[in-house]
Amino acid sequence: MQNPVPPPDVEITVTSFLEAVRLLRDMETEAQTPLRAKDPIFMARKKQIETYISVFLKSVEQKQPTFKLLETPQDFKLPVKAEVIFQDSVHFYEALKLSFGKGGIYIKTDMHMPIDSLLDLKVTLLAENVTFKVAGKVIWVNPRATQGRPAGLGIKFYKLSPLQRQVLEDFMAGLLPPDALPHLSE
């Protein structure tokens, strides 16, 4: 059951980034009702949550995950084992936010790989002690920081089952905690 958005006379306390994402999603849904859409206090609170999320993401924006190949590729047409280590779920969320609309993840790295390279990714979120595996394909490369986007690789997830896609969508919506992400390996 979803928690309703607190009434205007109740102070909102946010204890985690993902809780803020979940609250914003609920507020966006509620803002579509005629009563809330015209409520200036509600809209101001929604703006506060949006600002909190934006500031938080800006603080992690410059931090780069560790990305390394676990084997020397002989042929980039065959999947290459690789590992990406994020400090925590917020950094993973930020990487998904940059490319999940396109069905993948953006990994900030100075490493270059050919377009269409196949990857068997092992993803680790250090703070939460969560590890999972997912298949990916390099769909674009940004060799150096340009147009506000850091150097890195755009990786499209492939072979995702409907359940795995739902796990990622629910995580992005703040509905699932990071410890549910190992279901992606199934």
Regions found by a protein language model. Give the residues of each.
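Short beta-strand-centered aromatic/proline hotspots
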Residues: 133-142
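C-terminal output/interaction extensions
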Residues: 2, 145-186
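Short beta-strand segments
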Residues: 93, 130-134, 151
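N-terminal helix initiation/capping motif
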Residues: 1-100, 174-186
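Short beta-strands and strand-coil junctions in structured, solvent-facing domains, enriched
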Residues: 104, 144-145
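Short strand-loop-strand
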Residues: 77-122, 152-154
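Short, charged beta-turn/beta-strand-edge "cap" motif at the junction between a beta-strand
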Residues: 124-129
